[in-house]
């Protein structure tokens, strides 16, 4: 067991495609487990879990040129590692498309954000990433109560917006707009929440 999973940090190591990023696991002094599944995918498990624990995914970098959320995620992970930020919920951090980030572009061949449904698409780098991420998400949520699952997909606006910070709650086949989630959003002093009631990309 090593003292640290990363040469520099989760973000820097995930983006350094010239270096391997082998899977590994460490437990820090307070009992929190850090489990690196693969490049860009890190699970954080608190020392204590029960039936009330949430299972939260924080994904970013689905659009490779939206880098601010990646820095935010990296800071959260560093704060958890140092013990500054206590963690009571099971977490999965995802940096989705390191190759696109390194290319300073939104995507390479196809918009990754449009590939997470069950339709058939032509084979692209992004389709392979989407299929892998869907498997990772399914594995993370396996045997967990549906009402304890949150997925926060972090983006940053590339155009001027009326609201500096906002949440988009997409239309889904499953109930995802829980009171607890909305209270969490409110606690973050987000400017606005947009409830999308029609399919969107």
Language-model segment annotations:
Residues 1-201:
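Structured catalytic-domain cores with a bias toward divalent-metal coordination
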């Amino acid at each position: 067991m090593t003292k640290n999973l990363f040469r520099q940090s989760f973000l820097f190591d995930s983006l350094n495609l010239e270096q391997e990023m082998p899977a590994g696991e460490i437990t820090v002094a307070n009992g929190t487990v850090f489990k690196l599944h693969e490049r860009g995918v890190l699970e954080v498990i608190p020392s204590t879990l029960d039936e009330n624990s949430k299972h939260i995914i924080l994904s970013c970098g689905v659009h490779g040129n939206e880098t601010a959320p990646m820095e935010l995620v990296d800071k959260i992970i560093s704060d958890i590692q140092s013990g500054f930020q206590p963690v009571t919920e099971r977490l999965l951090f995802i940096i989705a498309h390191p190759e696109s980030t390194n290319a300073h572009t939104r995507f390479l061949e196809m918009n990754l954000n449009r590939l997470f449904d069950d339709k058939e698409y032509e084979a692209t780098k992004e389709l392979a990433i989407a299929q892998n991420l869907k498997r990772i998400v399914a594995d993370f949520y396996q045997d967990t109560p549906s009402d304890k699952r949150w997925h926060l997909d972090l983006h940053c606006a590339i155009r001027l917006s009326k609201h500096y910070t906002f949440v988009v709650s997409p239309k889904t086949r499953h109930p995802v707009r829980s009171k607890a989630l909305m209270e969490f959003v409110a606690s973050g002093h987000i400017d606005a929440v947009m409830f999308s009631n029609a399919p969107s990309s």
